[in-house]
């Protein structure tokens, strides 16, 4: 149920107007991009979410609502309410673990997602790379960072192997191990893009695990594993730049030192930070 209003409302107003029987239970602060809170009434639970990035356009939050509205409940929470700065979705019962599931199980989830109808908007990385450069702390910008940005701008993004709806933030903290199987939460970066971009973006523990995930996916998708791995590798520089830039952007927004540490580690992987 989308509800349009130009006037933001408070949490208490949201609950009293739309969920008067519900009461807050707990707050989640998992992940690097923010939190949400849980409301409950007679055993029924919903998650109340706000935009993780206060500077992002409202259209980005609306896209997340639209993505959830068209995804099957077997892989994502169903949304119940959208209005400015607020979204209410189903709570997914299950375990959120600190490590990825078996690669074959994860490959099955991603392959099923990629078989769904496209969302209708493309993920393009270059505008984000340029935004993060522009919005970062000037003292943190380096010649190497700018050089890599120009190199990617000239090279352009890899041509998609297959264009599908993507989640784009697959890591252990966004996977719910439910009684009916794996499900994904936090769809704020969802959009249409290359399946290899999704696979490249998974937060794996090591290269061996990454290769196995790609191999398992290739078997399901009937793609030569070597061909898919080559395409995944083409996205690596783009994703490292995306991660490094996002950490720098969040550092300037929040002043949280964890983002500096994560950015420095990412730049070391790219060998562009002196």
Swiss-Prot record:
Protein name per the record: Thiamine kinase
The enzyme's E.C. designation: 2.7.1.89
Family, per entry: Belongs to the thiamine kinase family.
Pfam families from the UniProt entry: APH
Record's keyword terms, sorted: ATP-binding, Kinase, Nucleotide-binding, Transferase
Catalytic activities: thiamine + ATP = thiamine phosphate + ADP + H(+)
HAMAP family for the chain: Thiamine_kinase
GO process annotations (BP): thiamine diphosphate biosynthetic process; thiamine metabolic process
Molecular-function GO term, any one: ATP binding
Organism: Shigella flexneri
InterPro entries given in the database record: Aminoglycoside_PTrfase, Kinase-like_dom_sf, Thiamine_kinase
Signal peptide coordinates: none
Gene3D superfamilies: 3.90.1200.10
The organism's place on the tree of life at top rank: Bacteria
Pathway: Cofactor biosynthesis; thiamine diphosphate biosynthesis; thiamine phosphate from thiamine: step 1/1
Function comment: Catalyzes the ATP-dependent phosphorylation of thiamine to thiamine phosphate. Is involved in thiamine salvage.
